[in-house]
């Protein structure tokens, strides 16, 4: 069953007098916060691209990664604006379709990020075979995850939160992760292998920058898994939204990675002189 339910995205000014709006004000604030903070991805991606261009960095794969990150931001805005986050289990709603587009680009961005790190670490002729095997493996994981997502949306018409959510529907009321979301995490995990395998080959400053990026991403992942999109946490007198924090910390990770890429490129140029 297909149910398209796009409605106007309202501002704080006209949310209450608008007829037909069934969402609570807290839910509206949560989704509105998610929309606004989501643009941090785009800003960080654009700033990152500008930094790499100014530094005349020629590594095309990082530009592709940042470009995907900026597009992912736009698709995520659509995810949070579709009918204020409404899901109906068993119904192919606009929100569910929006989540498909959003999750697809999230997975593609994660895949591109892992591939970029692999291409960064394995550049010598001796490591090309290892790099290609790694890229094929990560790409296979990406295809599997997108297949699972497609099954969830277009066959099940639902994305239950099996991990940490007890199988609850993806309605933003509880924390937890769906199969495709867990698959996205699995897609990113090979980065840990890349870091461990190349840790001693990096300079001290490269290591610390990368450790910072991984640490921030880990904190962001834990925070967003604890609360649903519609939940306003009790922290800070009810002014804390977990998913919005995920957006902002994710944007911070983007910039940290850009600084790491620039530092690594600069170190190589200095060593070649």
Mark where each language-model region is.
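Early transmembrane hairpin module of multi-pass membrane proteins
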Residues: 2-126, 130-131, 146, 207-211, ...
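Alpha-helix capping and helix-coil boundary motifs
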Residues: 59, 171-174, 194-203, 207
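Alpha-helical transmembrane segments and terminal signal-anchor/GPI-anchor hydrophobic tails
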Residues: 152-163, 186, 200-208, 212, ...
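Non-transmembrane, juxtamembrane loop and terminal tail segments
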Residues: 272-273
């Amino acid at each position: 069953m297909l149910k398209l339910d796009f409605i106007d995205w309202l501002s704080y000014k006209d949310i209450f007098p608008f007829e037909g709006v069934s969402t609570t004000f807290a839910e509206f604030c949560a989704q509105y916060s998610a929309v606004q903070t989501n643009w941090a991805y785009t800003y960080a991606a654009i700033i990152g691209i500008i930094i790499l261009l100014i530094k005349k960095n020629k590594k095309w794969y990082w530009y592709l990664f940042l470009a995907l990150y900026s597009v992912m931001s736009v698709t995520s805005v659509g995810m949070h604006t579709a009918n204020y986050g409404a899901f109906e289990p068993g119904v192919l709603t606009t929100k569910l379709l929006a989540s498909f587009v959003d999750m697809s680009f999230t997975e593609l961005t994660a895949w591109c990020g892992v591939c970029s790190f692999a291409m960064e670490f394995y550049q010598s002729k001796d490591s090309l075979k290892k790099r290609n095997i790694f890229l094929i493996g990560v790409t296979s994981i990406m295809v599997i995850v997108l297949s699972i997502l497609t099954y969830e949306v277009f066959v099940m018409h639902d994305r239950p939160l099996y991990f940490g959510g007890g199988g609850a529907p993806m309605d933003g009321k509880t924390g937890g992760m769906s199969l495709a979301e867990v698959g996205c995490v699995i897609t990113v995990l090979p980065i840990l292998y890349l870091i461990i395998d190349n840790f001693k080959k990096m300079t001290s400053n490269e290591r610390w920058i990368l450790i910072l990026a991984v640490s921030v991403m880990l904190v962001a992942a834990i925070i967003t898994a604890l609360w649903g999109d519609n939940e306003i946490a009790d922290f800070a007198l009810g002014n804390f939204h977990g998913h919005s924090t995920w957006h902002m910390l994710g944007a911070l990770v983007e910039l940290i990675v850009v600084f790491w890429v620039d530092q690594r490129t600069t170190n190589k140029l200095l060593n070649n002189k």
